[in-house]
Amino acid sequence: MEKVESFELDHRKVKAPYIRKCCLLDGKCGDKVTKFDIRFLQPNKEEFGTAAMHGLEHLLAHELRAKLEGIIDLSPMGCRTGFYLSIWGDREASEIKEALEYSLEKVLEAKEIPAANDIQCGNYRDLSLFGAKEYAKEALERGFSLNIYGE
């Protein structure tokens, strides 16, 4: 059985916030998909509140698409310390960092959360614009490293 990539990462050694290129997947038809670990919070020490994380997910899913072509999905991590970004092509973490910083600045300017209704969202009552902005502000202040060990 194939190993789960994220379970192979020693979460005790990483230093958040960071952006990590997890893997490059090669499809049977020559297509490529890159997966990134966008870690906002320190594993096993911090975690997002669900409403803030859910709000940030909606906002980033919307804003990142203005800067990055080929986004497949932005998915919250079950541990609530960050997000996974899947995108078409062989992409680099530096490109993701630039787009993420732009998008987080846009989050700070947001007046509402996109798709915050019962038609477009399966849990629209659990969203926090205030919380999303607080995490965006903190992440921008701390800065995202491209070195997961913070060196």
From Swiss-Prot:
Transmembrane segments: none
Record key words, sorted: Autoinducer synthesis, Iron, Lyase, Metal-binding, Quorum sensing
Enzyme class, broadest EC rank: lyase
Cofactor(s) essential for the protein: Fe cation
Cystine bridges: none
EC number: 4.4.1.21
GO biological process: quorum sensing
Positions with a binding annotation for Fe cation: H54, H58, C121
A Pfam cross-reference name: LuxS
InterPro entries: LuxS_sf, Metalloenz_LuxS/M16, S-ribosylhomocysteinase
UniProt catalytic activity: S-(5-deoxy-D-ribos-5-yl)-L-homocysteine = (S)-4,5-dihydroxypentane-2,3-dione + L-homocysteine
A GO MF label: S-ribosylhomocysteine lyase activity
CC cofactor note: Binds 1 Fe cation per subunit.
Key word Ion transport present: no
Classification via PANTHER family: S-RIBOSYLHOMOCYSTEINE LYASE
Similarity comment: family membership: Belongs to the LuxS family.
Function: Involved in the synthesis of autoinducer 2 (AI-2) which is secreted by bacteria and is used to communicate both the cell density and the metabolic potential of the environment. The regulation of gene expression in response to changes in cell density is called quorum sensing. Catalyzes the transformation of S-ribosylhomocysteine (RHC) to homocysteine (HC) and 4,5-dihydroxy-2,3-pentadione (DPD).
HAMAP family for the chain: LuxS (MF_00091)
Subunit structure: Homodimer.
Protein name according to UniProt: S-ribosylhomocysteine lyase
Gene it is expressed from: luxS
